[in-house]
Regions:
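Short, acidic/polar
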Residues: 35-49, 114-126, 195-211
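Alpha/beta enzyme core
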Residues: 42-58, 62-64, 132, 141
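Substrate-binding cleft of secreted/luminal carbohydrate-active enzymes
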Residues: 130-141, 153-247
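The substrate-binding groove and active-site-proximal loops of carbohydrate-active enzymes
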Residues: 25-39, 74-82, 148-156, 193-194
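Active-site-proximal loop/short-helix segments
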Residues: 6-14, 51-81
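Aromatic-lined carbohydrate-recognition surfaces of secreted/lumenal glycan-active proteins
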Residues: 3-4, 57-58, 79-120, 160, ...
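Active-site-adjacent "subsite" loops/lids of carbohydrate-active enzymes
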Residues: 3-50, 204
Length: 247
């Protein structure tokens, strides 16, 4: 739940001393407690739903990931998990009459974390109020040693398997969970010292890991929207290509 807020500082997250908070990318964040902004976002979503799209997917549906003390509103004693849950619940209520699916992206670590990572993303709280939940399970984004994997980016099958297994296990315990539809890696993480080039073999390894757990839906992300090298050869597995410029 972010937006450049320099022109509207009253609705932005601030430091405890009153200064405008900006994340590491220099982006100011809207206050997630701000119901006026909820209506703004959901109004746009409703307009899109009326235009004929069949799904509304919410990205950055969270608080900023920072360890700095922040000032958000007089309501900030309410749990962050509760705020994100209520927003998505309201989104579902307003969008379902238009016949669209409602989905949300979450950090890849969320299904393997008991809490909310201090950003308001808790697996069961989100999965219970939407149609699809998409953990961003890019192997390059996991720290060395995740699930005892020395270099996650160099082990796409194992990384996706252990990450998705947490999601499947938790959803199986729920009465009515959202369908799990992860984001998987369609790019090469050249910034990592220990990385491999991602092509069709690495893509298929991720898909196979999901399939072994019964997860047959997924989205592929490439930050430059370059999917040609991944799709040169025909595959027996259908591939959903997302034109998402950022996750």
């Amino acid at each position: 739940m972010y937006k450049r807020q320099r022109q509207f500082p009253a609705s932005a997250i601030k430091h405890k001393d009153g200064r405008l908070f900006e994340d590491r990318d220099g982006i100011a964040w809207v206050n997630p407690y701000n119901r006026e902004y909820w209506n703004y976002v959901l109004g746009i979503a409703e307009e899109m739903a009326r235009s004929g799209v069949n799904e509304i997917q919410f990205d950055y549906i969270r608080f900023p990931d920072t360890n700095k003390p922040l000032l958000m509103s007089a309501e900030e004693k309410r749990a962050r998990v509760e705020v994100i849950h209520e927003f998505l619940k309201e989104a579902y209520k307003r969008l379902k009459p238009h016949g669209v699916y409602v989905s949300a992206d979450v950090f890849g670590l969320v299904p393997n974390t008991a809490g909310d990572l201090y950003i308001g993303q808790h697996w069961e709280s989100l999965s219970s109020v939407i149609d699809y939940i998409s953990p961003m399970m890019y192997p390059s984004h996991y720290s060395k040693g995740f699930a005892s994997i020395k270099d996650p980016d160099m082990n796409p099958y194992d990384t996706i398997y252990h990450s998705a297994r947490g999601a499947v296990n938790r959803s199986q315990k729920m009465t009515q969970p959202a369908t799990i539809r992860p984001w998987i890696q369609g790019f090469t993480a050249t910034w990592l010292r220990s990385h491999i080039k991602y092509g069709q073999t690495e893509l298929q390894a991720q898909i196979d890991a999901l399939a072994s757990l019964g997860v047959d839906e997924y989205l592929i992300w490439n930050p430059g929207n370059r999917y040609e090298n991944l799709l040169k050869q025909e595959s027996n597995v259908s591939i959903d290509v997302a034109d998402s410029a950022s996750n």
